Amino acid sequence: MHCPFCFAVDTKVIDSRLVGEGSSVRRRRQCLVCNERFTTFEVAELVMPRVVKSNDVREPFNEDKLRSGMLKALEKRPVSADDVEMAVNHIKTHLRGTGEREVASKMIGNLVMEQLKKLDKVAYIRFASVYRSFEDIKEFGEEIARLQD
């Protein structure tokens, strides 16, 4: 690491500690040229795959879009914010775990439906009705029947 004072390349780590519930590392460093000390923080960079939409447009993964879609389905339902965050994190972990650089938006939609089914059946039906473009009451009934199985 370059020294921020003299820009020398040679520095040594004097002390390392975990901070932020173990999600990052704080390091005290000392320059071997000018002997100045400074602090650095290391955080793992977790790259999310790009999303390939049904029309083949590619866009960066948007966690806010994922969360807002789920929250819209869960509106006025008895589900805690913590449970929603756990579901969002589960989906993100699954997407990162694929190891793919790109994932289909359809996969994300299916993961959302899977999580909503666990959280709240009404929210699941709300989301499914939009996601699967239900055309009539019969399709609602069929989906509800599948839930009851």
UniProtKB/Swiss-Prot annotation:
Zinc keyword on record: yes
GO molecular function: ATP binding; DNA binding; zinc ion binding
ZnF (unnamed) intervals: 3-34
Pfam families cross-referenced by the UniProt entry: ATP-cone, Zn_ribbon_NrdR
Lineage top rank: taxon: Bacteria
Cofactor note: Binds 1 zinc ion.
Record-annotated membrane-spanning stretches: none
InterPro entries: ATP-cone_dom, NrdR-like_N, RNR_NrdR-like
ATP-cone domain residues: 49-139
Key words of the record: ATP-binding, DNA-binding, Metal-binding, Nucleotide-binding, Repressor, Transcription, Transcription regulation, Zinc, Zinc-finger
Obligatory cofactor(s): Zn(2+)
GO BP terms: negative regulation of DNA-templated transcription
Role: Negatively regulates transcription of bacterial ribonucleotide reductase nrd genes and operons by binding to NrdR-boxes.
Family to which the UniProt record says this protein belongs: Belongs to the NrdR family.
Record's protein name: Transcriptional repressor NrdR
